[in-house]
């Protein structure tokens, strides 16, 4: 950070995704999701705020497209990702004008977290007819990090999935 003259961006990208039926869901697993998806981004943002403020920086939270939807066996995941989404929106109001805060909501992106059977059924519903790739998320993040007049926004990077789902 010192070598590059300070910190101008933070991307809260840590995640855990494991479908678990509600009857098998433990409080420990529920809490783990909130720790990774909400507590860690809070602590990082809080701990790095002064450095970000000094550079008029940007914070990005990777949320998901689950808001307002019921996803089977993902109560713990969707509850924590939507808590992160709301925290980021609130931080956009709390940290302005010093730090911009936005979210990226990935749709079907090729990753080790997706089970191939589930992935195939999701792709059938994506208007663009293909999955996204990590570079699609990186492009959105680069755009938000460089955009000095965008804050409090959620960008869906989902090939149009949320339009039809």
Where are the model-predicted features located?
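Catalytic Tyr-X3-Lys loop
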Residues: 8, 16, 23-42, 60, ...
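Conserved NAD(P)H cofactor-binding loop of Rossmann-fold oxidoreductase domains
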Residues: 13-18, 160
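Substrate-binding pocket helix/loop in short-chain dehydrogenase/reductase
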Residues: 21-22, 29-31, 114, 122
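Amphipathic alpha-helical dimer-interface segment in Rossmann-like NAD(P)H-dependent oxidoreductases
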Residues: 36-54, 92-93, 97, 142, ...
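Catalytic loop of short-chain dehydrogenase/reductase
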Residues: 58-83, 88-96
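Conserved Rossmann-fold SDR core element
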Residues: 85, 95-109, 150-157
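Catalytic Tyr-x(3-8)-Lys segment
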Residues: 117-136
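C-terminal substrate-recognition "lid" of short-chain dehydrogenase/reductases
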Residues: 133-157, 162
